[in-house]
């Protein structure tokens, strides 16, 4: 489950009269054919048919080779990924926007990867928007890490969000640590990340990954 958002003057949401034609600018295992450096020379051609491009998660992420497509983010403020460097990403966004194409970031904030079960999240430095270090105390208490002796007593006292619906709606994400969005520190870090992605990297909007994993009241 995901949610798309385009920046407006108030909240990040899709306008009622939405007429853009979107291109998904990647595939699950397309690191070679859709790297930033490969897409950049095609920016003008893309602009002939599309007004919006959805790019894959651009933050540094867990995994190697074709298994690392960005959906287990390791450090949000590090925009060097398997798709290319931050410099290459910014150059791609600049060329797309020069042709009138808006660019969506694939945002993964439901969960984080680290060095261990409950520790090892690198510090995120968003410059003027703040510096944040998420810790074990920012992980939901019902995360899989709760079963690890090394994490005993370290997790937050917050449960993961659940829609009170069948299991496919809400609940935890086993492959990485679930962040407790009910905590102010987590929400502040996410907010700084989004503003930084817009103002510093140049994105126009967001596609939210695993949006079912946290309270929708926090997306606005």
Describe every region a protein language model picked out.
Residues 1-6:
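Bacterial N-terminal signal peptides
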Residues 205-211:
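Short catalytic-loop micro-motif centered on adjacent basic/acidic residues
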């Amino acid at each position: 489950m995901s949610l798309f958002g385009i920046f407006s003057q108030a909240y990040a949401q899709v306008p009622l009269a939405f007429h853009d034609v979107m291109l998904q600018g990647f595939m699950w295992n397309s690191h070679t054919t859709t790297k930033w450096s490969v897409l950049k020379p095609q920016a003008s051609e893309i602009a002939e048919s599309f007004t919006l491009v959805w790019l894959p998660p651009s933050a540094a992420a867990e995994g190697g080779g074709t298994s690392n497509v960005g959906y287990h983010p390791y450090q949000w403020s590090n925009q060097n990924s398997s798709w290319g460097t931050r410099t290459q990403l910014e150059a791609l966004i600049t060329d797309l926007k020069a042709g009138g194409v808006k660019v969506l970031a694939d945002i993964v904030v439901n969960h984080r990867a680290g060095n261990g079960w409950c520790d090892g999240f690198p510090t995120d430095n968003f410059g003027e928007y703040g510096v944040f270090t998420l810790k074990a105390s920012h992980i939901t208490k019902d995360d899989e890490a709760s079963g690890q002796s090394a994490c005993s007593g370290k997790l937050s006292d917050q449960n993961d969000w659940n829609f009170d619906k069948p299991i496919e709606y809400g609940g935890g994400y086993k492959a990485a640590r679930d962040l407790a969005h009910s905590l102010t520190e987590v929400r502040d870090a996410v907010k700084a990340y989004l503003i930084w992605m817009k103002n510093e990297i140049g994105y126009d909007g967001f596609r939210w990954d695993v949006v079912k994993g946290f309270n929708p009241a926090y997306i606005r």
